[in-house]
Amino acid sequence: MHIVHTIAELRQQLSGFKRPAFVPTMGNLHEGHIALVRQARPLGDVTVSSIFVNRLQFAPHEDFDSYPRTLDADAERLEAAGCDVVFAPREKDLYPEPQTFKVHPATDLSDILEGHFRPGFFIGVSTVVMKLFSCVFAGMPTGVAAFGKKDYQQVMVVRRLVQQFALPIEILAGETQRAEDGLALSSRNSYLSPAERQEAVHLSRALRALGEAARAATGQPDLAALESQALQALARRGWKPDYLTVRRRADLAPPQGALADVPLVVLGAAKLGNTRLIDNLEI
């Protein structure tokens, strides 16, 4: 396995290949990332993973500076998973000058949910994804890129980006990997204290309960009331929830009318202590 830091080094390593399988990450890897590498690997002729903590998607008050940087351990895990090339650019490598050209995704998808509570987040995500795609796939006839469904809205934004720019890239959405108690694996789980780690599973349980209540309702359910009850129940446990909501899988819009035949997803984000966690469940 090769570890490279510059775009020129990356392209040199990829010369001669025609279909990269790419897994972008911010490092501090867990089994969810490794599962994506294993799923993507058979779909390309070379497997690439990037490790880059992207400043553009962090607000000034968020955890950019404290986000764990664990390159050596991450590289060991990626090599064991069969990764061929690790692209670990420094900030000066990916952004040698201020990134004044940015990708602004459609507001109907990017200004809701995560985008509402983290303004500018999806601009930062879309910009770095487009830049990484340019680094990995430039000159390639086709390729595949893998993202985890835990970041459900992000996957949808990336799919729209690929569609709108006619990029010859297949997007693979990997299922959320969970701990035995149901907690979605996340790099930020490492912030949790032992007591918070025990409590953290209640986010996925709240989403499951909300989804079951929505599906059990006959006719046109009062989703606002069900969502409010779910928020209050989580808050009583000491959480600070941003949202717990039922949305259509197709576009993340609130469903209208009866829900019987509508593919839905329940999404949630809440802060436990100083750690903000997100999760979702398709129902």
UniProtKB/Swiss-Prot annotation:
Organism encoding this protein: Polaromonas naphthalenivorans (strain CJ2)
Listed EC numbers: 6.3.2.1
Description of how the protein assembles with itself and partners: Homodimer.
GO cellular component: cytosol
Active-site residue numbers: 33
Any further remark recorded for this protein: The reaction proceeds by a bi uni uni bi ping pong mechanism.
Family the entry assigns: Belongs to the pantothenate synthetase family.
Protein name stated in the entry: Pantothenate synthetase
Annotated GO biological process: pantothenate biosynthetic process
Task of the protein: Catalyzes the condensation of pantoate with beta-alanine in an ATP-dependent reaction via a pantoyl-adenylate intermediate.
List of residues binding beta-alanine: 57
Gene coding for it: panC
Leader sequence residues: none
InterPro entries assigned to the protein according to its UniProt record, in alphabetical order: Pantoate_ligase, Pantoate_ligase_C, Rossmann-like_a/b/a_fold
Subcellular location: Cytoplasm
Gene3D superfamilies documented for this protein: HUPs (3.40.50.620), Pantoate-beta-alanine ligase, C-terminal domain (3.30.1300.10)
Residues annotated as binding (R)-pantoate: 57, 154
GO molecular function terms noted in the UniProt entry: ATP binding; pantoate-beta-alanine ligase activity
Lineage: Bacteria, Pseudomonadati, Pseudomonadota, Betaproteobacteria, Burkholderiales
Pfam families from the UniProt entry: Pantoate_ligase (PF02569)
Sorted UniProt keywords: ATP-binding, Cytoplasm, Ligase, Nucleotide-binding, Pantothenate biosynthesis
